[in-house]
Amino acid sequence: MPLYETVFIARNDVSQQQVEAVADGIAALLETDGGAVKKREYWGLRSLAYRIKKNRKGHYMLLGLDAKPETIKEIERQLGLNEDVMRVLTLRVDEIDEAPSVILSRKGDERERGFRGPKPAGRFESGRGGAGGARRGYDDREEFRARNEREDGRDTDGEAE
């Protein structure tokens, strides 16, 4: 039998157990027709690229299936009728990887939560901008003195206001 990968996105207001129940229903349907679920991954609640049916997030589930084409059509029909499922994508594949998918392998990576890596060296940090990264013709002490004088209530000329 041909191999397929199906990814479906469930609404964000359903629980993970309900998403697992939808996947269990698919597995039961497959087993009655002689197919099998070879791989099953819950990717979690993730942000959507755009709003779908007024939802900004969704529960993602990947299923690796070994089934007849008629059974796959029935699975897609059942998922389309389910109100909790927003989107379904089924692809025919040559083989199903037993290793965790790229989505799961990146999940614990620090880049997942907004970490963009170390800041690249700018003009001043690279040593091309002058002595020690300071601006040309600029003295830190002058700014410090001017700031202190303003806080003391004195004008920058040294006179009291």
Curated annotation (Swiss-Prot):
Q: Has the keyword RNA-binding been applied to this entry? A: yes
Q: Which domain of life is it from?
A: Bacteria
Q: Which InterPro entries match?
A: Ribosomal_bS6 (IPR000529), Ribosomal_bS6_sf (IPR035980), Ribosomal_S6_plastid/chlpt (IPR020814), Transl_elong_EF1B/ribsomal_bS6 (IPR014717)
For bias kind Basic and acidic residues, which ranges apply?
136-161
Q: Gene Ontology terms, cellular component aspect?
A: cytosolic small ribosomal subunit
State the Gene Ontology terms under molecular function. small ribosomal subunit rRNA binding; structural constituent of ribosome
Give the region (Disordered) as residue ranges. Answer: 107-161
- Kindly list the residue ranges recorded as spanning the membrane: none
Keyword Cell membrane appears in the UniProt entry: no
What GO biological process term is on the record, naming one?
translation
Record keywords, A-Z: Ribonucleoprotein, Ribosomal protein, RNA-binding, rRNA-binding
Query: CDD domains recorded for this chain?
Result: bS6
Q: Which Pfam families match?
A: Ribosomal_S6
Q: Which PANTHER family match?
A: MITOCHONDRIAL 28S RIBOSOMAL PROTEIN S6, SMALL RIBOSOMAL SUBUNIT PROTEIN BS6M
Q: What does this protein do, in the record's words?
A: Binds together with bS18 to 16S ribosomal RNA.
The UniProt entry's sequence similarity note says: Belongs to the bacterial ribosomal protein bS6 family.
Q: What name has this protein been given in UniProt?
A: Small ribosomal subunit protein bS6
Naturally occurring in which organism (per UniProt): Gluconacetobacter diazotrophicus (strain ATCC 49037 / DSM 5601 / CCUG 37298 / CIP 103539 / LMG 7603 / PAl5)
Q: Which gene encodes it?
A: rpsF
